């Protein structure tokens, strides 16, 4: 039986992010890399996360922290609401909401991730967390106020 990809694409995992996470293919752009990294969090694949972090970030030192997070976090869904990059610039950005439960509480990560392309491969560098007012529209596109949606 086929399994839908956790990235929210509505495509089978084997045809969507699995080829990137397994190393069969290299993510062709920042959005695919971000979606496949989300899948790696869901699938608890620290190796892929470390491999796709830019080498300057020293991600290998985060392995223990990743493993601890895997044990306590259940990922509930991903919504990408903005992405932009230009291959000529070798830099790209993807904005998303990732929903999760941890310790019985539901939460969300809202981030604008920055990616860098080197030697034909995209890498995650870092992300910023935009601030939203409680009465602002939720960036996930639900049409609800932030406080009634991802800001809970």
From Swiss-Prot:
A Pfam entry, by short name: YchJ_M-like
Recorded superkingdom: Bacteria
HAMAP family named in the record: UPF0225
Family stated for the protein in its record: Belongs to the UPF0225 family.
Name this polypeptide is given: UPF0225 protein YchJ
Organism field: Shigella flexneri
């Amino acid at each position: 039986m086929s399994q839908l990809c956790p990235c929210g694409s509505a495509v089978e995992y084997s045809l969507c992010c699995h080829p990137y996470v397994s190393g069969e293919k290299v993510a062709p752009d920042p959005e695919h890399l971000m979606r496949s990294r989300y899948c790696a969090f869901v699938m608890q694949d620290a190796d892929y996360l470390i491999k796709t972090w830019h080498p300057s970030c020293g991600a290998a030192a985060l392995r223990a922290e990743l493993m601890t997070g895997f044990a306590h976090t259940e990922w509930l869904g991903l919504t990408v609401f903005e992405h932009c990059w230009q291959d000529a610039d070798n830099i790209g950005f993807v904005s998303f909401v990732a929903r999760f439960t941890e310790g019985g509480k539901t939460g969300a990560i809202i981030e604008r991730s920055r990616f860098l392309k080197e030697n034909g491969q995209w890498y995650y560098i870092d992300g910023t967390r935009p601030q939203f007012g409680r009465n602002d529209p939720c960036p996930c596109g639900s049409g609800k106020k932030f406080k009634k949606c991802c800001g809970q």
